[in-house]
Design a protein with these regions (language model features):
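Conserved class I S-adenosyl-L-methionine
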Residues: 44-54, 72
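Conserved SAM-binding loop of SAM-dependent methyltransferases across substrates and taxa
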Residues: 55-67
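Helix-to-beta-strand junctions that scaffold the AdoMet/dcAdoMet cofactor pocket
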Residues: 66, 130-131, 145-147
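A short glycine-rich, Lys/Arg-flanked "PGG" loop and its adjoining helix->strand segment in the class I
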Residues: 135-147
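Core SAM-dependent methyltransferase catalytic element
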Residues: 173-176, 188-211
Length: 211
């Protein structure tokens, strides 16, 4: 029985890898990244922050779409995702010919920036991987967002991970945030319902709004 479970687990991981591979037929990761990046809009001279940038894919895609703005991708990198690094991000940016992006080691739980440092904050499938209070992580990212700045955060916003997100959205609105909403992305927007169910990302959504 144990061997059977192990085989099924390996098969699931292989199928997941093929689905998300940039070189595969479906290229789901690329589709999601471009979907998030398409909602990232910065004014000329604006500053954008990508929290938990990993390989730099979202930072680079967003920077390409906003050539007159500057993007910063931050991540802890390290053992959990050993294949990702600051050097890899920089290499990927060079390969894409993108010069308006740079990368820095930083922790999403305590970002090394003053309040209201950025015009936009974005992220893709990051906070659910960090143990602890995920709403507090969101608050930390919003702390560095300037008044009038936009946030575009994509993650798995299930109740057991994030708690009551409707109450969180209401609290933001009560504080003066505008156009705050959760947009489901696993209903065909980024991911097919059938894919999302077996990948266990059915609660994927974009958290967007203006501070």
């Amino acid at each position: 029985a144990g061997a059977g479970i192990g085989f099924l687990g390996s098969a699931w991981l292989l199928a997941l890898y093929r689905l998300f591979s940039y070189n595969g037929k479906r290229q789901l990761a690329r589709h999601i990244i471009e979907g998030v990046a398409s909602r990232v809009q910065l004014p000329e001279g604006g500053r954008g922050l990508d929290v938990g940038c990993g390989s730099g894919a979202l930072s680079i895609a967003a920077a390409k779409r906003n050539p007159k703005a500057a993007f910063l991708g931050v991540d802890r990198w390290g053992q959990d995702y050993a294949s990702f690094s600051q050097a890899l991000c920089e290499d990927n940016a060079r390969a894409e010919g993108v010069r308006n992006v740079r990368f820095l080691r930083a922790d999403a739980r305590q970002l090394p920036f003053p309040d209201e440092s950025f015009d936009l904050v974005t992220s893709n499938y990051v906070y659910h991987n960090i143990p602890g209070d995920r709403q507090a992580l969101l608050r930390e990212s919003l702390r560095v967002l300037r008044k009038g700045g936009r946030f575009v955060i994509h993650d798995i916003f299930s109740r057991h991970i994030y708690g009551d997100m409707q109450a969180f959205l209401q609290s933001l609105q009560d504080e003066g945030y505008t156009e705050v909403r959760l947009i489901p992305t696993a209903d065909g927007l980024f991911v097919k319902r059938s894919e999302a169910k077996w990948m266990m990302i059915a609660d994927s959504a974009l958290l967007i709004g203006i501070k």
